[in-house]
A protein has these predicted regions:
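A beta-strand-loop signature enriched in Asp, Gly, Thr, and Trp
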Residues: 142-194
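Structural signal for beta-propeller blades
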Residues: 32-36, 89-91, 138-140, 191-193
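Beta-rich, blade/repeat-based domains predominating
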Residues: 3-24, 55-78, 112-127, 159-180
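Loop-centered beta-sheet repeat module
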Residues: 81-138
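Short loop/turn segments immediately following beta-strands, especially the blade-tip
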Residues: 37-47, 94-102, 143-151
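Conserved beta-strand positions in repeat-built beta-propeller and related beta-rich domains
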Residues: 15, 22, 27-30, 75, ...
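Beta-propeller fold detector
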Residues: 1-2, 47-56, 103-110, 151-159
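Flexible glycine-/small-residue-enriched beta->alpha junction loops
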Residues: 28-60
Length: 194
């Protein structure tokens, strides 16, 4: 099914369950700095029931002039929604009401290095490690994770930056293989898969 939400530019979405149990889809709108909630009834998208507008800006006056949410998901051990925001250098957390209302968790925010431009956060299968892909500085931050507590344990460059310091490159995507033994990253500009 299809739902029209005029003027929206959704770049990523997730549901609050599998195809049998989900009753909501959560979408991030990159250009309008919003998170939208769409209801599902009998496995069909029905209508947009809620919006939440992010505010602020980041270090880079061009690429971070406003919030740019890029990824949405659920924490592995909580019923909290998380939104990765390239424009704010943050991962924000939300409580979701039965009616789809989103409430920003003002206590828990994962603040990243200014100007790094996070684009995606994924978890290993055990749910005890979080991997944040930073588009603007081409790094991956690895966190030990436990119930809304994130402890940075490693930051990795996604390509050898010393080889060509003038190269303009950005990290495009990260993904685990099927058993979590390898994390793959794609670089635009450096044009590499690592």
């Amino acid at each position: 099914s299809r739902v029209t939400d005029k003027g929206k530019t959704y770049v990523h979405a997730c549901a609050n369950g599998d195809v049998e149990t989900a009753d909501k889809v959560f979408c991030v709108d990159y250009f309008n700095s919003e998170i939208s909630v769409i209801s599902i009834v009998k496995k069909k998208l029905v209508k947009c029931i809620s919006h939440f507008k992010l505010n602020g800006s980041g270090k880079d006056p061009v690429k971070q002039a406003q919030p740019y949410p890029t990824y949405v998901g659920f924490l592995p051990d909580e019923d909290k929604l998380y939104v990765v925001c390239l424009g704010l250098d943050q991962v924000c957390f939300f409580d979701v009401g039965e009616d789809g209302t989103l409430t920003l968790d003002n206590v828990h925010t994962l603040q990243l290095e200014p100007g790094c431009g996070p684009k995606k956060m994924i978890f290993n299968q055990k749910g005890d490690r979080a991997y944040v892909m930073n588009e603007l500085n081409s790094t991956i931050c690895v966190y030990k994770y436990d119930h809304l507590n994130f402890e940075l344990i490693q930051t990795i460059d996604s390509y050898p930056k010393d080889d060509d310091p003038e190269l303009v490159s950005s990290l495009s995507d990260i993904k685990f293989n099927s058993d979590d033994s390898h994390l793959y990253a794609i670089n635009k500009g450096h044009d590499s898969l690592v």
